[in-house]
């Protein structure tokens, strides 16, 4: 009998518990990595994992253990896609928060964006390059598959410029 995949909400709750155990040194990098590998094998699981790990206070995404990087790389294009989308969304939200003068929220969005950039540098280079080029095509030329994504969230010209800059920043470092 196949294991039931977690819902998005369950994935967030499970991830938060795992990260707390990891922070408290109750589980090893390797055990955490195995659990993350299972979690990111489904779209909802991966979404829940990234919401908690990218936006939360855990240091995991700031100092990714090799075992975790290996599991995230092995997950392939699904993890790359979510990481690129999170890069775009957090970058656009940093612009929004900057406009409204909410420096705390802006800093949080910038932290997520930085974490996404660093993660993307450690994932499979060919997949990352292809996915970033697709996003760039939409932000710069308003063509390709990501135009609908940008329009869905209502990103304006300033946000699209910031997103394209964040794409180039991934490649520069």
Positions of predicted regions on the chain:
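Alpha-helical rod/repeat scaffolding segments in eukaryotic adaptors/tethers
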Residues: 29-32, 36, 75, 99-109
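Low-complexity intrinsically disordered segments
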Residues: 1-26, 127-173
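Conserved binding-pocket/active-site segment within a compact domain
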Residues: 87-152
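Amphipathic alpha-helical elements of HEAT/ARM-like alpha-solenoid repeat scaffolds that form extended
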Residues: 11-17, 46-54, 89-93, 147
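Alpha-solenoid helical-repeat scaffolds
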Residues: 5, 9, 26, 40, ...
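Short secondary-structure junctions and interdomain/linker hinges
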Residues: 43-47, 57-60, 79, 123-127, ...
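Aromatic- and glycine-enriched beta-alpha-beta binding-site module
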Residues: 55, 61-99, 103
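A glycine-rich, hydrophobic loop/mini-helix early in the fold
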Residues: 32-73
């Amino acid at each position: 009998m196949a294991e039931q995949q977690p819902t998005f909400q369950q994935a967030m709750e499970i991830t938060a518990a795992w990260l707390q155990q990891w922070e408290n040194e109750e589980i090893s990098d390797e055990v955490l990595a195995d659990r993350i590998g299972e979690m990111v094998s489904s779209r909802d699981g991966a979404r829940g994992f990234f919401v908690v790990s990218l936006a939360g206070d855990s240091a995991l995404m700031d100092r990714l253990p090799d075992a975790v990087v290996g599991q995230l790389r092995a997950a392939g294009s699904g993890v790359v896609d979510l990481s690129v989308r999170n890069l775009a969304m957090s970058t656009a939200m940093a612009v929004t928060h900057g406009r409204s003068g909410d420096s705390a929220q802006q800093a949080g969005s910038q932290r997520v964006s930085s974490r996404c950039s660093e993660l993307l540098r450690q994932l499979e280079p060919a997949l990352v390059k292809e996915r970033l080029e697709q996003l760039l095509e939409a932000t710069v030329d308003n063509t390709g598959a990501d135009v609908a994504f940008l329009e869905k969230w209502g990103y304006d010209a300033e946000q699209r410029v910031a997103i394209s800059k964040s794409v180039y920043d991934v490649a520069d470092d």
